């Protein structure tokens, strides 16, 4: 069934434009609150957000919805997404909410929902919420004496700081490291530098002055140029770039080179396998992860299980098959020993542990494999289903046959934007570029004709 509200990572869109309106946010609160209002205990929801201008507006709307449904609302304020997942469990809440559009610009916002176990909701539960959103919600409102209460909770940042610090192995200290960190003017602008400093590092921070409109603006994991310059300027040993809600991370080595999520997963997988911490004899990644990662793991006797794009699908596979390392090339790294969702800071701490234990530089530690040439391009669409066109399907089949075992092809609609994503990778860069350009042309022609 086609979804109207939920995408691959909750509900997302431009603020004050459907579906990201205060009205819908309140209705989501009522609908989700109704579904999780089970049992005779006093029900509660924890609500966090990042630093976007629209965050307070949507926070208030969701508080209204949840309290109207009879849940007490614990308001956390600006805080990372993984902290919301953690606090949902530790505060014994029935539901957790993160108001954020992750790496998107400030004009956008979104709603991510977590169950009482701290995991993102399943497709089935999201479908239940969508079904309720299409109905008259007045019948779901709590009785007058059962309306929930709202309160801001103090000390939540300290809880997360201590949690993050505990994920660094006890035999490791960050003393002697100069770390530059870019907080993307987002949710981790207070907690991330504090964690690194308390663990002994010399910390140089940028992207820690949010004003409501500068989240992810020329900063953070999707725009690491400022961090690269800062690493060079202060001669840092490493740069850490988080995104707006701190659930993803990109590393900059001492030479200013970018280290993506695939390389980070390789480092953690190899390190954890050596220490016998790795479960599942491999890791979980998406179809977008580089073929070079797969070959590296294979050489180490480790496997790579692939899922469709979206960290929630990575996590689902990890849970079903007992893996404890998974993630995405974009920098969503999920370490289930320490959390239920991607955590950029905790992932960075595992890289720092590998650096300290080996005594090698970040560039030496993090260049675990040579990436296979990979090209990703997008085609914007305004409607229709170009991937169902016979010409497009034939072009895809021909490209897959040409690549055979020497490469991979992934073509999929974006879960958050009106785009078709075309990715090809293989050992022959010229071949990859030609294949992608031909497919883009075919899809564009079909789109135009439609």
Curated annotation (Swiss-Prot):
UniProt keyword list: Isomerase, Magnesium, Metal-binding, Phosphoprotein
Catalytic activity as recorded in UniProt: alpha-D-glucosamine 1-phosphate = D-glucosamine 6-phosphate
Cofactors: Mg(2+)
Active site (UniProt): 102 (phosphoserine intermediate)
InterPro entries assigned to the protein according to its UniProt record, in alphabetical order: A-D-PHexomutase_a/b/a-I, A-D-PHexomutase_a/b/a-I/II/III, A-D-PHexomutase_a/b/a-II, A-D-PHexomutase_a/b/a-III, A-D-PHexomutase_C, A-D-PHexomutase_C_sf, A-D-PHexomutase_CS, Alpha-D-phosphohexomutase_SF
Pfam families given in the database record: PGM_PMM_I, PGM_PMM_II, PGM_PMM_III, PGM_PMM_IV
UniProt-listed Enzyme Commission number(s): 5.4.2.10
Residues bearing the modification Phosphoserine: 102
UniProt-listed Gene3D superfamilies: Alpha-D-Glucose-1,6-Bisphosphate, subunit A, domain 3, Alpha-D-phosphohexomutase, C-terminal domain
CDD domains on file: GlmM (cd05802)
UniProt: Mg(2+) binding residues: 102, 243, 245, 247
GO cellular component term, pick one: cytosol
Post-translational modification: Activated by phosphorylation.
Cofactor stoichiometry and binding remark: Binds 1 Mg(2+) ion per subunit.
SUPFAM superfamilies xref list: Phosphoglucomutase, C-terminal domain (SSF55957), Phosphoglucomutase, first 3 domains (SSF53738)
Family note: Belongs to the phosphohexose mutase family.
PANTHER family for the chain: PHOSPHOGLUCOMUTASE (ALPHA-D-GLUCOSE-1,6-BISPHOSPHATE-DEPENDENT), PHOSPHOHEXOSE MUTASE
Annotated protein name in UniProt: Phosphoglucosamine mutase
Record organism: Rhizobium johnstonii (strain DSM 114642 / LMG 32736 / 3841) (Rhizobium leguminosarum bv. viciae)
């Amino acid at each position: 069934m086609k979804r109207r509200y939920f995408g691959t990572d909750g509900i997302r869109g431009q603020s004050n434009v459907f579906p990201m309106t205060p009205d819908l946010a309140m209705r989501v609160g009522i609908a989700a609150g109704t579904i999780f209002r089970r049992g005779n205990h006093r029900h509660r929801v924890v609500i966090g957000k990042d630093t976007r201008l629209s965050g307070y507006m949507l926070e208030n709307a969701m508080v209204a919805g949840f309290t109207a449904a009879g849940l007490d609302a614990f308001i956390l304020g600006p805080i990372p997404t993984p902290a919301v997942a953690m606090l949902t469990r530790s505060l014994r809440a029935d539901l957790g909410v993160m108001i954020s559009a992750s790496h998107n610009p400030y004009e956008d916002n979104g709603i991510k929902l977590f169950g009482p176990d701290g995991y993102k909701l399943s497709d089935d539960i999201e479908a239940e919420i969508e079904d309720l959103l299409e109905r008259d919600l007045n019948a779901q409102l709590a009785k007058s004496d059962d309306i929930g209460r709202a309160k801001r909770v103090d000390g939540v940042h300290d809880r997360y700081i201590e949690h993050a610090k505990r994920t660094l192995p006890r035999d490791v200290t960050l003393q002697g490291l100069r770390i530059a960190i870019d907080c993307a003017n987002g949710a981790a602008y207070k907690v991330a530098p504090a964690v690194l400093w308390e663990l002994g590092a010399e910390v140089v921070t940028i992207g820690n002055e949010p004003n409501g409109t500068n989240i992810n603006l020329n900063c953070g994991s999707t725009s690491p140029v400022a961090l690269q310059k800062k690493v060079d300027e202060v001669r840092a040993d490493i740069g850490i770039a988080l995104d707006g809600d701190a659930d993803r991370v990109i590393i900059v080595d001492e030479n200013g080179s970018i280290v993506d999520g695939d390389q980070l997963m390789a480092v953690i997988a190899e390190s954890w396998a050596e220490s016998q911490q790795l479960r599942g004899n491999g890791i979980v990644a998406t179809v977008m992860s580089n073929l070079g990662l797969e070959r590296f793991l294979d050489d180490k006797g480790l496997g790579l299980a692939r899922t469709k794009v979206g960290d929630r699908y990575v996590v689902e596979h990890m849970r079903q098959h007992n893996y404890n390392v998974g993630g995405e090339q974009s920098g969503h790294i999920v370490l289930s020993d320490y959390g239920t969702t991607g955590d950029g800071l905790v992932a960075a701490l595992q890289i720092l542990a590998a650096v300290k234990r080996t005594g090698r530089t970040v560039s030496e530690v993090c260049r675990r494999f040579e990436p296979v040439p990979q090209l990703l391009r997008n085609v914007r669409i305004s409607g229709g289903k170009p991937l169902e066109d016979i010409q497009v399907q034939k072009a895809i089949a021909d490209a897959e046959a040409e690549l055979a075992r020497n490469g991979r092809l992934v073509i999929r609609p974006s879960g958050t934007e009106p785009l078709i994503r075309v990715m090809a990778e293989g050992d022959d860069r010229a071949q990859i570029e030609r294949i992608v350009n031909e497919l883009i042309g075919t899809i564009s022609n079909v789109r135009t004709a439609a």
